[in-house]
UniProtKB/Swiss-Prot annotation:
Claim: Manganese is one of the keywords in the record: yes
Record's keyword annotation contains Transmembrane: no
Gene behind this protein: CIPK5
Record family assignment: Belongs to the protein kinase superfamily. CAMK Ser/Thr protein kinase family. SNF1 subfamily.
Keyword list, A-Z: ATP-binding, Kinase, Manganese, Nucleotide-binding, Phosphoprotein, Serine/threonine-protein kinase, Transferase
InterPro entries per record: Kinase-like_dom_sf, NAF/FISL_domain, NAF_dom, Prot_kinase_dom, Protein_kinase_ATP_BS, Ser/Thr_kinase_AS
CDD domains recorded: CIPK_C (cd12195), STKc_SnRK3 (cd14663)
Molecular function as annotated in GO: ATP binding; protein serine kinase activity; protein serine/threonine kinase activity
Species in which this protein is naturally found: Arabidopsis thaliana
Catalytic activities: L-seryl-[protein] + ATP = O-phospho-L-seryl-[protein] + ADP + H(+); L-threonyl-[protein] + ATP = O-phospho-L-threonyl-[protein] + ADP + H(+)
Protein name, per record: CBL-interacting serine/threonine-protein kinase 5
Domain (NAF) ranges: 307-332
Domain notes from UniProt: The activation loop within the kinase domain is the target of phosphorylation/activation by upstream protein kinases. The PPI motif mediates the interaction with the ABI (abscisic acid-insensitive) phosphatases.
Active-site residue numbers: 135
Domain Protein kinase as annotated: residue spans: 12-267
Length: 445
């Protein structure tokens, strides 16, 4: 039988392929008994095992998802495993992304309020369980058949095609546009307070139909975020303006808390808090010996007291399975876009690699900031000594964006050095190069 139609452990019939990432495929499924529709994420264990620590992340993921069962969070129903695959059986959400609704235009304030009420209720519940999401955005918020909002895992939220619209950023695994300034600055941060900032950006987008901080140039967008530099459209009500102004506060210690959000007149209007699900059955299941593959011992553990770190990102494992993190649309069209790449290495590791590589190229290397380095050639070129800078930004946990640009010297010499020496030498730390296009021209910093 073809994989798309096979029966899984005698419990689920697997149907059409919904989408796929680097490590996983997601299928439409249906319970054999009961007929409930589900989404089944199939993870290739061999590929996961090649990444140190990732199997532990799966087990932690299971424990944490058991903590956050809530009407406004996509439910993880159970996890099963064989010797070669891991299966996440998830609630199937039929209504698609909230992003798709926003892409058609801004929402009426009452509709935006309803979605925001549900978002805050779910986030508050997560925080009460010691879990922070850290990548809240409309692409990760799904709507069920009743129009109710559900916070999604990243793998599922990346499946529906995204219709490009001016004013909204479109990336598969997250965007700095929704990230709190303290996270972008690579300082220690409170995950719960960072979530509140992201909720503020989401509310603004719901009401405006565009981002509060938007610029084709990534650095300019960062500057706006660091200053909370945004404007309200004229149709925003005074109450909505007051709330957003308290959500988008740069200092996390002065940012409004969720209990205070719950007390605001704007949110309390027609608000009925949902009741959280009762956790009364184990999520982990063992595979049957009669199935297509044997069960591997230890792939699914029952824990009476799941242990998770404070404000652990409950969804980051599935996020890591997505296939790309393309930020090319954020950069100036004239800049040579292959001067930007993303890395799964830490910012510190990336900086050390850049310094080592460029020193081996006989360049003078000097750090100007913790995560910015200037490199200068030791010989005169056509237009003096070639000089370039590299800056590393951690835009999400375990994801760094690196930007190279020429600060002095001849453009052709820079292009040749970058293409023939820098890029090949950095390949082992690169997750993806962005927007390779050999016909574009470089632009100085």
């Amino acid at each position: 039988m073809e994989e798309e139609r096979r029966v899984l452990f005698g419990k689920y019939e697997m149907g059409r392929l919904l989408g796929k990432g680097t490590f996983a495929k997601v299928y439409y499924g249906k319970e054999i008994i009961g007929g409930e529709c589900v989404a089944i994420k199939v993870i290739n264990k061999d590929q996961v095992m090649k990444r140190p620590g990732m199997m532990e992340q799966i087990k932690r993921e299971i424990s944490i998802m058991k903590l956050v069962r809530h009407p406004n969070i996509v439910e993880l129903k159970e996890v099963m495993a064989t010797k070669t695959k891991i299966f996440f059986v998830m609630e199937f959400v039929k209504g698609g992304e909230l992003f798709c609704k926003i892409s058609k235009g801004k929402l009426h304030e009452d509709a935006a309020r309803r979605y925001f009420q549900q978002l805050i209720s779910a986030v508050d519940y997560c925080h009460s369980r010691g879990v922070s999401h850290r990548d809240l955005k409309p692409e990760n918020l799904l709507l069920d058949e009743n129009g109710d909002l559900k916070i999604s895992d990243f793998g599922l939220s990346a499946l529906p095609e995204q219709i490009l619209q001016d004013g909204l950023l479109h990336t598969q695994c997250g965007t700095p546009a929704y990230v709190a300034p303290e996270v972008l600055k690579k300082k220690g941060y409170d995950g719960a307070k960072a979530d509140i900032w992201s909720c503020g950006v989401v509310l603004y987008v719901l009401l405006a139909g565009c981002l509060p901080f938007q610029d084709e140039n990534l650095m300019n967008m960062y500057r706006k975020i660091f200053r909370a530099d945004f404007e309200f459209p004229p149709w925003f009500s005074p109450e909505a303006r007051r709330l957003i102004s308290k959500l988008l506060v740069v200092d996390p210690d002065r940012r409004i808390s969720i209990p205070a959000i719950m007390r605001t007149p704007w949110l309390r209007k027609n608000f009925t808090p949902p009741l959280a699900f009762k956790i009364d059955e184990p999520i982990c299941s063992q595979s049957s010996k009669n199935n297509e593959e044997e069960e591997e011992d230890g792939d699914c553990e029952n824990q009476t007291e799941p242990i998770s770190p404070k404000f652990f990102n409950a969804f980051e494992f599935i996020s890591s399975m997505s296939s790309g993190f393309d930020l090319s649309s954020l950069f100036e069209s004239k800049r040579k876009v292959q001067s930007v790449f993303t890395s799964r290495s830490s910012a510190t590791e990336v900086m050390e690699k850049i310094e080592t590589v460029t020193k081996e190229m006989n360049m003078k290397v000097k750090r100007t900031k913790d995560f910015k380095v200037k490199m200068e050639g030791k010989t005169e070129g056509r237009k003096g000594r070639l000089s370039m800078t590299a800056e590393v930004f951690e835009v999400a946990p375990e994801i760094s964006v690196v930007e190279f640009c020429k600060s002095a010297g001849d453009t052709l010499e820079y292009d040749r050095l970058y293409e023939e020496e820098v890029r090949p030498a950095l390949n082992d730390i690169v997750w993806s190069w962005h927007g390779d296009n050999n016909n574009t021209s470089s632009e100085d910093c």
